[in-house]
Each structure stands twice: as C-alpha cells, then as structure tokens.
Regions:
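Alpha-helical transmembrane segments
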Residues: 1-30, 54-94, 126, 133-136, ...
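Short aromatic-rich membrane-water interface segments that cap or initiate transmembrane helices
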Residues: 43-46, 78-79, 137-155
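Juxtamembrane helix-capping/reentrant segments at transmembrane boundaries
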Residues: 34-46
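Membrane-interface starts of transmembrane alpha-helices
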Residues: 44, 105-109, 152, 308-312, ...
Length: 338
C-alpha cells in the first residue's frame, strides 16, 4: 500500500510542477487550441499539457517499480509486460505530440494507435480469453466450468488492438470540458488500482503501482486543468491515458474468469465508452462521417441545456463513480467465484 501511495504522490507532484513550464513552452511553440464553433474555449488555450502527465506518470513508475524491483529481488517487477506498456505509452506520447502540432489525418491517428496496440501484444500484453455466453461455439479452447473461452492468437491480437483503439479514442473524445477527461481517468485508474491490489497474481502489486501513477498524474494535472483551465491535455495526454488504462485493464480486470469478466473493464471505462458509442450511432443515423468532430457528446448536450462546466463535470464524475463501484462489486463476485 505504501508503494501505491508513493507512486500517486510522485506522479502528482511531478505533473503539477512541470505543467506551468509545459504551458509556456506550448504557447511559445504554437501548440494552441484556437476558439471555433465546436470548441468551448473562448480564448486560445495551450494544448500540450499531456507532456506533463506523461512525465509525471513515467517518473513515478520508474522510481516505484525500480524500488519494488530491489525490494523483491527483481521478481515480477520489470517484466516484459511493464516494459511494453511504457514503450507503447512513449510511442503514443510522441505521436500525440505530433498531432497536437500538425493535426494528423484520421488515418494516421488510427495507425499510430494500432501500432501502440501491436507493441503491447509483442510484449505479452493481450486479451488471452473472455467469458463466452455462446458456450464453445467460437472455437478454440473452452472451459465450461468457468465459462471461459481461451482465444486463438489471431483473435487475441485483434481484440487487444481493438480494445486499445476504442479506449484511447474514447478518452480523447471526452476531453472537451475543463477537467473532464483527467477526472474520469483518475476515477477509472483508482478503480483499476484497487482491482490490481486484490489480484492473486505476482504482477498484481506492480499493476497497482502503474494505475496509481495514472491517478496521481491526473490529479496533479487537474490543479491546472480544472475550470477555469489554464491548459488542456491535448492528444498526447488523452492517448497516453487511454493506452495505459486499456493495458492495465487487459492485465488486470480481464483476468477474472467469471460470467461478468467482460463487463468489468467496460464499466470501469464506461463513461467514455458509452458516450462514444452513442455519438457514433448518431453519426451513422445522420449519415455523417464517423471521424467528424461535432457537438454530439454528452458534455456538449448538457452545456447546450444551460449547465455550466462545473455542473457538467461533477455530474459525469458521479456517473463514472457509480459505474466504477458497480464494476468493483462485479469484480469481487468474479474473484470469489473463480
């Protein structure tokens, strides 16, 4: 537990201290969101704040995991999976920063995220199995005792990359109101940290450290991003947070062999996922491009009803908390029944 607190505190402290420098650098280099019809900011806003989030997260993980490495004689600390998460996060930090400056086309954004997912797979982070309500009809290896379907390599890679893509894009999509994405990600990461700490696996404590570092980085960034925001996280922040949350859920929440295992990570990340599904559905019905930016997201619709930014943020925080509490309850059911 001490290590988890240290990871969160270090990440929060580093992120909070670095953000003002990142803000000045973003303004100087031109990484700024200009006011326009689909945005809510009324003045230019520095948008590369994710640099601070990434640095806070990275420094906290390196320090705490290395500390645990020496305390545990290297057992289940600096594993290939942990290295894969950091490498994939670093790749998306670079790609996200490029997008914050150059506004990459949708196909290049998709390619960057897919490559990050493949990096995770190459380092052993993948969805190995899921609960299967259809029994053994999907092929592969099926265990009827726990209703667990072990995926083929091809299916495993596909679902892993798809999950990483969905989570990363959905986190990016909710970054539209001051403090929203950082707060929701902090709530989700805290839930995943609690789950990881209860896993009866050697890597559970290390996963908890990584999740705690995300919590700390988000809270440290909120010091500057909560309304009225002085800086936004930009693509770099949203992509790093989405990637790490997706990876932690794969290594933790998906491991529960029970009828609820697929629901757990979906509920933990329910706010961005359900919002994104709703928006995509409305775009399809309107025959609008799926990648087109618009004001169909929940936070936009609440603002249009006359809510202020703080009301919107705290309402969505509350929804996220309810979903995460539900996920924790289902996780306990799955863990005890396994």
């Amino acid at each position: 537990m001490t290590g988890i607190l240290v990871a969160a505190i270090v990440a929060a402290f580093v992120t909070m201290l670095v953000t003002p420098s990142v803000r000045r650098w973003s303004e100087k280099m031109g990484a700024v969101d200009q006011p326009e019809a689909r945005r809510i900011n009324t003045a230019p806003m520095p948008r590369a704040g994710g640099i601070a989030i990434f640095l806070g997260f990275l420094i906290a993980v390196v320090l705490t995991v290395t500390g645990r490495h020496f305390a545990r004689s290297g057992q289940h600390t600096w594993t290939m999976q942990v290295l894969g998460v950091l490498l994939a996060a670093t790749w998306l930090a670079i790609a996200g920063l490029v997008d914050d400056f150059k506004n990459l086309a949708a196909r290049w954004q998709a390619l960057a995220i897919i490559l990050a997912g493949l990096i995770l797979v190459a380092f052993g982070v993948r969805i190995e199995g899921i609960t299967n309500p259809l029994g053994s009809t999907l092929g592969g290896k099926y265990d009827p005792l726990v209703n667990w379907h072990t995926l083929s390599i091809g299916a495993s890679i596909f679902l892993t990359v798809l999950w990483v893509f969905i989570v990363t894009k959905t986190v990016d999509a909710i970054d539209g109101v001051d403090g929203l994405a950082a707060g929701v990600c902090a709530i989700s990461a805290a839930t995943l940290a609690l789950m990881a700490a209860q896993l009866h696996t050697p890597e559970g404590p290390t996963l908890a450290l990584i999740a705690a570092a995300i919590v700390g980085a988000c809270l440290g960034f909120l010091r500057h991003n909560y309304h009225p925001a002085k800086i936004i996280m930009g693509t770099i922040g949203a992509w790093v947070l989405g990637l790490v949350l997706a990876a932690i859920s794969i290594m933790g929440a998906f491991k529960v062999a029970a009828a609820v295992s697929v629901l757990v990570p979906v509920l933990v990340l329910g706010v961005p996922i359900f919002d994104y599904i709703h928006v995509l559905t409305r775009r399809l019905l309107a025959r609008a491009p799926l990648t087109a930016a618009d004001k169909r997201h929940l936070h936009h619709r609440l603002l249009a009803r006359g809510w202020n930014q703080k009301q919107v943020v705290w309402f969505i925080y509350s929804v996220a908390i309810v979903l995460c509490i539900t996920a924790l309850a289902l996780f306990q059911v799955g863990r005890l029944s396994h």
